[in-house]
Amino acid sequence: MERLPLSPAVLFLTITLPILYFWILHTSPARHHGKQLPLPPGPPRLPKIGNLHQVPRQIPWKKYKEWSDTYGPIMSVQLANTIAVVFSSWDLIKTHVERRNTIYSSRPSVPFFLHATGGLNASILPYGPEWKLQRAIRSSVLKPSMTIKYRDVQSMETTQLLHELLSTNDFSVCLRRCIASVFLTVAYGERCADHAGLEAIDRLEELNRAIALHAEALFSGAAGILAQLVLPQALVDRLPVRWKKDADILHNRLTADLVARTRAALARPGWNWVKAFAIKEGTGSGEGDGEQGREVGLKRLAYMVGSLYEASMAASQALRVIILAGILYPDATRRMHDELDAVVGKDRLPDFNDAAQLPYTQAFIKEAMRWRSLTPMGSPRATSDEDECRGYHIPRGATVLVNVWAINHDEGVFLDPFTFKPERWIENPDLPQLLYGMGQRACPGRHMGQDSLFLGTARLFWAFDMALPDGAEAIDQERFLDSGTTLAAFLPDFEVRFTPRSEKHREVIENSVVVSSDVSSVTVAT
């Protein structure tokens, strides 16, 4: 009888299972509980694999909330050879995690991400000198005194956004172009002036999406459990696993794209982030750049700027959430319209000078981000040292998750948490805002992001009435509110009809629009 060839998956398991068996016999989750303190409580675990079989890939925050209701606001789960500690209490975050920032500011080691980005993406760097250096350099262009200088760019792009929505309801594409163009202008000195320019953006997003999807698939599959959570990195590097080849391919493509953008930005006239980072690093154009810059090189510079792209594009997803809230809660939208009409009137577009006089508009944004978080489990962290919290031992190297969804729906923090109430933020300005993270790992671009959300929201709701198109399927709130994974929870697609609120509003938009491919007129100078 002819012998059937082994599939790659079978071959992989044939090679790795004996190694795995030997490995798990000689390893177990961290058992050294300093001073004999126990780990935080959690659901019962199976030998070796722990709770891997119980953690759902989709909407895991609800399962963690269910567990925290049973085991308390600090709990733990075992993911094979990894301990994950989950915080579900704002009080614990405020009084413990934020006060011990240096312990809780590292990142879990995920081999696929490290391979796919060459270990150069600052968002996944462990806490240490390299991360601190990159954080300082990025903060130099993202601090409030600098982000104010980007407001002319944001104003121009949101004006074009309004003009585009006069002739199309394809708002998701328009939002992507708007936010992408803001980033490209300040980062590389190159606008995305029309939808044709999105082709280059699509390539970059495709690569980033592929990396994320591969990582998600690894976490949810058997091969991923072996490669990501059980086998040590030294052993992973020696195994003929397919994901490593995929990661190398994605890394090469992503690097080529980012380096090409960086070279072009260095050659353009005017100021941009690439040039600012190059000066800080001493990289420049490669002519007598200084010892540190020579070591860093163009590739590192390319990733330092390029890794900010995905974070910046979160603003387009956030605006989609705000638009959805505007459709589902018409009473709140009418109140925002009334405020905009009273402060701005019909003869001009809202601008940043109106911000202080638009408290309800600002509150609407905050409530939308609480109501439907983009990152319900936050960004995973790791402990750089062991710690003690409420009599429990937290091991060094533990993965740390913050259940943002649970905190945002905690009745002890937000009264009537399942009701959409923007006024809660006016009545209590000190309510926690978790959109941009917290502590030293908070998003460095949060000030720029807040500006984009304010101006985008104020102008969209000043300009348009928004509703579902005639005959469109009603929005299933459960489907839209309960979708996503541990890493991201973007909204499913939905349709919106944009109608100018009056002919006067249409006239102001048409007369205000500025569409120019001449970047020199909007490039930011220091």
Curated annotation (Swiss-Prot):
Enzyme class per UniProt: oxidoreductase
Pathway(s) this gene product operates in, as recorded in its UniProt entry: Mycotoxin biosynthesis
EC number in record: 1.14.19.71
Pfam families listed in its UniProt record: p450
Topology in membrane: Single-pass membrane protein
Keyword Disulfide bond: no
Entry protein name: Fumitremorgin C synthase
Organism: Neosartorya fischeri (strain ATCC 1020 / DSM 3700 / CBS 544.65 / FGSC A1164 / JCM 1740 / NRRL 181 / WB 181)
Gene name as annotated: ftmP450-2
